[in-house]
Design a protein with these regions (language model features):
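Low-complexity, acidic/polar, glycine-enriched regions of mature
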Residues: 19-195
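Bacterial N-terminal signal peptides
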Residues: 7-16
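Bacterial N-terminal signal peptides that target proteins for export
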Residues: 1-7
């Protein structure tokens, strides 16, 4: 049996998608809840002389998916305040001046559809379309996602760029430090299938 499955994706900066197992519910619609403990959001930001690496934690998520129509609903939330690069001074600057994480504590991806099919076994490549709300603004996104289903587990991986300066966040560059205007995000999501 073939089933389409979503995964997000997310995030950001800041963001965004997560994967989980889908459990059958009424009318052929599949339901899923996110496993934040086994999902990761990593980011890299290029800068003169070095590259900044960091992480965010997934806060929560729940999805509903209709394989027949490709319609997907729900939300995946990333805890922006959890952003960590391993350097306290840089992290304080990032949270206070770029992310404004006290004012905007979450980045939320709200998917609306899946393009492509997910097989019940093995790997599948799909695109997940939806809206990313980050730093108080909504941004339409289509995220390529690789989904692997094996036995009772699901793994989803997504890589995408977030143009954070274009999206209204402050460029932390100064006379001595120049950084990229876009951050690369890599999301790995783990879930368990229920039948």
């Amino acid at each position: 049996m073939r089933a389409r499955l979503f995964i997000y994706l997310l995030v950001f900066v800041c963001g965004r998608v997560t994967a989980a197992g889908f459990a059958p519910v009424s009318s052929g619609v599949l339901g899923s809840s996110v496993d934040p403990a086994n999902s990761t959001v990593k980011f890299t930001l290029g800068a003169v002389l070095h590259t900044v690496h960091g992480t965010f934690r997934i806060k929560s998520g729940a999805l509903r998916f209709n394989p027949a129509s490709g319609k997907l609903s729900g939300q995946i939330a990333v805890d922006v305040r959890s952003g960590n690069t391993g350097e306290a001074t840089r992290d304080r600057q990032m949270h206070a001046n770029v992310l404004e994480s006290e004012r905007f504590p979450d980045a939320v991806f709200s998917p609306d559809r899946v393009n492509g099919r997910v097989t019940s076994r093995g790997e599948s490549d799909v695109e997940v379309h939806g809206t990313m709300r980050v730093h108080g603004s909504d941004h339409e996104m289509t995220i390529p996602v690789r989904v692997r289903m094996q036995g009772g587990s699901v793994t989803a991986r997504a890589k995408f760029a977030v143009p954070y300066v274009f999206w209204g966040m402050k460029d932390p560059s100064n006379f001595f430090l120049q950084v990229d205007k876009s951050v690369n995000v890599e999301v790995t999501l783990e879930g368990t299938l229920s039948r």
